[in-house]
C-alpha cells in the first residue's frame, strides 16, 4: 500500500518517525550534556546484567546437582535406627503401625513357627 494513497497511514508513520527522532535526540542531548553520569549508569546496568547471568548459572547448576545427587544415600542420621536392619524407610513411612503392607510381612516368631511346622 502506498503512503500517498492513505493519508492516515502516512500520518501514523510520520508520527512514529517523529517520536523516534525526538527520543534519539533527547538521548543524544542527555549523553552529550552528562557523559559521566551516562557512563556510570551504563556501567551499573552492565554489572547488573553480568550478576544476573552469574546468579542464573549458579542456580541452574545447583538444581542440576540436586537432581543428580538424589539417588545417593543421605547422611547417616537421616534414617531411624531400629532393631530390624532390613527396613530402611524414612521416618514419615513409620508413623502408621497398622498399614496394609505391614500386615502381610510375618514377624520373626511367625517365620520360626512356620519353619518348625
From Swiss-Prot:
It is found in: Virion membrane; Host endoplasmic reticulum membrane. The chain crosses the membrane at residues 39-59. It is a single-pass membrane protein. This is Minor capsid protein p17. Glycans are attached at residues 12, 61, 98. Residues 97-117 are annotated as: Disordered. Induction: Expressed in the late phase of the viral replicative cycle. Keywords: Glycoprotein, Host endoplasmic reticulum, Host membrane, Host-virus interaction, Inhibition of host innate immune response by virus, Membrane, Transmembrane, Transmembrane helix, Viral immunoevasion, Virion. One of its GO terms (cellular component) is host cell endoplasmic reticulum membrane. It comes from African swine fever virus (isolate Pig/Kenya/KEN-50/1950) (ASFV). One of its GO terms (biological process) is symbiont-mediated suppression of host innate immune response. Disulfide bonds: none annotated. The lineage of its organism: Viruses, Varidnaviria, Bamfordvirae, Nucleocytoviricota, Pokkesviricetes. Interacts with the minor capsid protein M1249L and with the hexon capsid protein p72 capsomers; these interactions form a rigid zipper structure that stabilizes the capsomers. Interacts with host STING1.
Amino acid at each position: 500500500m502506498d503512503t500517498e494513497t492513505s493519508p492516515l497511514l502516512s500520518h501514523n508513520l510520520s508520527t512514529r518517525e517523529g517520536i523516534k527522532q525526538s527520543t534519539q535526540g533527547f538521548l543524544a542531548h542527555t549523553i552529550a550534556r552528562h557523559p559521566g553520569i551516562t557512563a556510570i549508569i551504563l556501567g551499573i546496568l552492565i554489572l547488573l546484567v553480568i550478576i544476573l547471568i552469574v546468579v542464573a548459572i549458579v542456580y541452574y547448576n545447583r538444581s542440576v546437582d540436586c537432581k543428580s545427587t538424589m539417588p545417593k544415600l543421605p547422611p547417616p542420621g537421616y534414617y531411624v535406627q531400629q532393631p530390624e536392619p532390613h527396613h530402611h524407610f524414612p521416618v514419615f513411612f513409620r508413623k502408621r503401625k497398622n498399614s496394609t503392607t505391614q500386615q502381610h510381612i510375618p514377624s520373626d516368631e511367625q517365620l520360626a513357627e512356620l519353619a518348625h511346622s
